[in-house]
């Protein structure tokens, strides 16, 4: 009911947690040299009035055609939300690819046991994960269920996801190197 009331096609606890992690990661990355100019070129100026933007979004909804540049309608509300939604969807997609590889599910471009978190090529990762998402949608439709990943990754969305991928792999200065870095 809440999902429908908010016009959200996917509303899960893990999605919410990943979205909030996106906000946290932004706060860690924004002071990093080079992050803000690239961010603003893709997402817009995060210094725009946040309260006004959210009030407008909840009053009027997303603008017509939001799908051409945003992963969700909510992402169109403000650059902060665009980043948080993009980061959350990147985490969804990496986990889809990683889970499929761990389960031995075959799809061209993804080897059994491959570590999707270590993938340095954002375009390759997004291609594989988007195809897996589509495959999952087909499988669940065969069972009469809703799509688990009902999103279209338009080229500007893929560009934002790739930007997030690059910065999340690099991390802020002083971040400890983890797998794939």
Label every PLM stretch briefly:
Residues 26-83, 87-97:
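Post-HExxH zinc-binding segment in Zn-dependent metallohydrolases
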Residues 7-11, 70-73, 77, 122:
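Residues at structural and domain junctions
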Residues 1-5, 64-71, 116-117:
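Short glycine/proline-rich turn/loop motifs
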Residues 1-17:
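Short pre-active-site segment immediately N-terminal to the catalytic Zn-binding motif
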Residues 12-14, 32, 72, 140:
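Residue-identity detector for threonine
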Residues 14, 18, 77-80:
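Hydrophobic alpha-helical segments and helix-packing faces
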Residues 16-29:
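Catalytic glutamate of the conserved HExxH
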Residues 75-181:
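Pan-zinc metallopeptidase signature
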């Amino acid at each position: 009911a809440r999902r429908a009331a908010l016009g959200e096609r996917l509303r899960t606890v893990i999605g919410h947690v990943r979205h909030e992690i996106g906000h946290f990661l932004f706060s860690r990355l924004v002071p990093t040299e080079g992050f803000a100019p690239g961010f603003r070129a893709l997402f817009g100026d995060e210094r725009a009035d946040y309260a006004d933007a959210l009030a407008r979004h909840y009053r009027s909804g997303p603008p017509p055609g939001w799908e051409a540049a945003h992963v969700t309608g909510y992402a169109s509300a403000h650059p902060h939300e665009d980043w948080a939604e993009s980061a959350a969807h990147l985490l969804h997609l990496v986990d889809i690819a990683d889970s499929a590889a761990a389960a031995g599910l075959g799809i061209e471009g993804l080897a059994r046991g491959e570590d999707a978190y270590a993938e340095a090529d954002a375009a390759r990762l997004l291609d594989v994960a988007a195809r897996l998402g589509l495959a999952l949608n087909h499988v669940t439709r065969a069972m009469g269920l809703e799509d688990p990943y009902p999103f279209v990754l338009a080229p500007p969305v893929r560009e934002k996801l790739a930007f997030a991928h690059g910065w999340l792999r690099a991390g802020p200065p002083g971040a400890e190197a983890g797998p794939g870095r």
